[in-house]
Regions:
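Active-site metal-binding motif and surrounding structural segment of the metallo-beta-lactamase
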Residues: 33-78, 157
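Active-site neighborhood of phospho(di)ester-bond hydrolases with catalytic His/Asp-centered motifs
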Residues: 26-30, 51-58, 77-80, 137-140, ...
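Cap/insert and terminal regions of metallo-dependent hydrolase folds
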Residues: 147-248
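Conserved catalytic scaffold of divalent metal-dependent phosphoesterases
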Residues: 102, 106-118, 130-134, 142-144, ...
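Metallo-beta-lactamase
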Residues: 78-133
Length: 249
């Protein structure tokens, strides 16, 4: 049975461990290596058990812990253009080509990726399917959710998706105008409303588990993110705790 451990979430760093039986994969390694090691051990996972690390994109809050790969000789998957900002030994690098559609097998997992929209070379989301049919979609930094992304993520049992900000809080923040524009752009981050609207097209009321991640400490409030998603799903007749299960990480 698939088990999810969200080791870190937010602008300070992101890392997600996905495991079933003795197989463990890591999505992003965005906190210091020593912190990842400690949090893995707290979750009952030895770092040397990790089969592979899959990178969404090469911003610091997603890759700063990759010395973990060098220490434990863990293969790292990323798109080819991201390697200029990733410091991993050459023999551990596994590149996705820019226009390639690839499937990676780590029994009992099948891992596929889809393109997202962020201000990096070629950012990705991932869909992890267990051989029993359980399906996890991970969509972190992206400025919008398009139809291809929705198609890739549909019929998942678990969604880990960013709900980064509330636009009104961004507008009154102390951030420079250029940073505000970046956050709100189509290659920035999802607002609570954008996340809610995407989930409204994905959730089928089958008891899906939803984790809202990557919340901005300055431009969001957990209760606001929850309320926004719940309100949109309520319009479809779905109730949190009955038709789906929602929490903020």
């Amino acid at each position: 049975m698939m088990k999810i451990d969200i080791l870190a979430s937010g602008s300070g760093g992101n890392a997600i461990a996905v495991r079933s039986g003795s197989t463990v994969i890591l999505i992003d390694a965005g906190i210091a290596r020593t912190k990842i090691e400690r949090r893995l051990l707290d979750a009952g996972i030895r770092p040397d058990e990790i089969a592979s690390i899959f990178i969404t994109h090469a911003h610091k809050d997603h890759v700063q812990g990759l010395p973990l790969a060098n220490k434990y000789r863990i293969p790292v998957f990323a798109t080819e253009g991201e390697w200029k900002d990733i410091h991993v030994d050459q023999e551990l690098r596994r590149s996705f080509l820019k226009n390639e559609v690839a499937t990676i097998h780590h029994y009992p997992f099948t891992i596929k990726y889809f393109r997202t929209h962020h201000d990096s070379y070629d950012s990705l989301g991932y869909v992890v399917t267990e051989d029993n049919g359980d399906r996890l979609s991970i969509c972190l930094d992206t400025g919008h959710v398009d139809s291809d992304m929705l198609e890739a993520m549909h019929w998942s049992d678990i969604y880990i998706i960013e709900a980064n900000h509330d636009p009104e809080l961004v507008a009154v923040s102390d951030y420079p105008d250029s940073v505000k524009a970046r956050i709100l752009s189509d290659r920035g981050h999802l607002s609570n409303q954008q996340t809610a609207e995407a989930l409204a097209r994905l959730v089928r009321g089958r008891g899906e588990r939803i984790y809202l991640t990557h919340l901005s400490k300055s431009n969001n409030i957990p209760e606001l993110a929850l309320a926004t998603v719940e309100a949109v799903l309520q319009r479809k007749g779905y109730v949190n705790g009955k038709h789906y299960f929602l929490e903020v990480v």
